[in-house]
């Protein structure tokens, strides 16, 4: 199966979901589009009937003072439609904010104009946490198959089927940590920690970008996340200078 985990030229749809939160967002969008199409069809039909009857009817509508039944209908019907869209939306919003029993935590720090990742659950023999910085790959250093303005020199590596909590903050100005395939979009604010969680259900490479205007090089802050099997993640940890689990 081919997955769309990166932006495509002239793409007019969502990237494929890799987490339950992202799947819920896609389903909510589909349901809302159905309700909106239903309302558009009904309103268009009413306008068509009104214009057609008004043209052929010599009776002056200015003598019609009110229509209680009609007024109730055009008040209650939109209200019901709004409730049908609001309840699933609020449920998904609160579910996305819930962070319960994460298996591991990754701290994400936004800086002008790069990202820094800290794995606070894993420390080296010297007591230092695993941390590194991620910069956009210069165009003259891109290899075949790499993406312009999306690939980075280092990736954030996380294990598959693992509840990961992201603690997001910034060191200078406002940034925004955004991963469309994971259903993540959280502000990175200086002096404040925002948290969001993700359960990636399949391996792959996912891309995102800073979504908050943060300066002249705002467009040069890509995010590259590699979701790997747990065995590969442990092997990657072993390459990070004698790391053990805290």
Curated annotation (Swiss-Prot):
Positions of transmembrane segments: 31-51, 72-92
GO cellular component: mitochondrial inner membrane
Enzyme class, UniProt record, top EC level: translocase
Binding-site residues, Mg(2+): 212
Cofactor(s) it depends on: Cu cation
Enzymatic reactions: 4 Fe(II)-[cytochrome c] + O2 + 8 H(+)(in) = 4 Fe(III)-[cytochrome c] + 2 H2O + 4 H(+)(out)
EC number: 7.1.1.9
Binding-site residues, Cu cation A1: 175, 210, 214, 221
Family statement drawn from the similarity comment of this UniProt entry: Belongs to the cytochrome c oxidase subunit 2 family.
Name of this chain's protein: Cytochrome c oxidase subunit 2
Organism listed in the record: Debaryomyces hansenii (strain ATCC 36239 / CBS 767 / BCRC 21394 / JCM 1990 / NBRC 0083 / IGC 2968)
Gene that encodes it: COX2
